[in-house]
């Protein structure tokens, strides 16, 4: 099933998303494109801040709040990443990462339609990212005419397209691989471990079954050798 969804995503990308992103890159100069990316990232900062707190990362929460205030004011509603220039780099946090720090396991690997690689925990986390986002909830309170679901979906779609634009060359290289599904899965697991452990993932422990297989392979190889004749 995952491979089928992956192939669906690849065809959709080739037929729709890649041509659209190519036109966007050709027509829109780099500076405005970067501005869009900056604004979308800045709108995610309140949710990053909440997840920092939920993970009891108070220092990172303070940095996130400071970055949001600076970029929203001096950076003109997030158009410019002024925080980078004053030494407050961006970091990513989402509810999937929060669940991981609470001890919730990965769950099965999933490939979601249009969204790409995920797992059971992160799929639930993605739903929380959409429905509990404080910016969308605040806008809904300010103007009741705005439909919360429509607003959240629109933002999610813009963020997904912006990600496709930023990964334009990377995705082209991925689809040239002999088995892009396996490569995408491996990259996903590595990236999520990197994010969950704030850039310092522990060394993976060797699986006991892998150890037993290696030992059995060594025994089989030894038994297959002809006995030395005196």
For every predicted segment, state its role:
Residues 34:
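A small/polar active-site loop signature that marks catalytic segments
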Residues 1-11:
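Mature N-terminal segment immediately following signal peptide/propeptide cleavage
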Residues 1-3, 18-22, 48:
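Acidic/histidine-rich, surface-exposed loop or edge segments in extracytoplasmic proteins
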Residues 37-39:
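Beta-rich strand-turn-strand
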Residues 42-120:
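Mid-length scaffold segments of soluble, non-membrane domains
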Residues 103-230:
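A structured, mid-to-C-terminal "fold-capping" secondary-structure block
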Residues 11, 49-53, 187:
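Amphipathic, soluble alpha-helical interaction motifs
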Residues 15-31:
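Membrane interface segments of multi-pass transport proteins and intramembrane proteases
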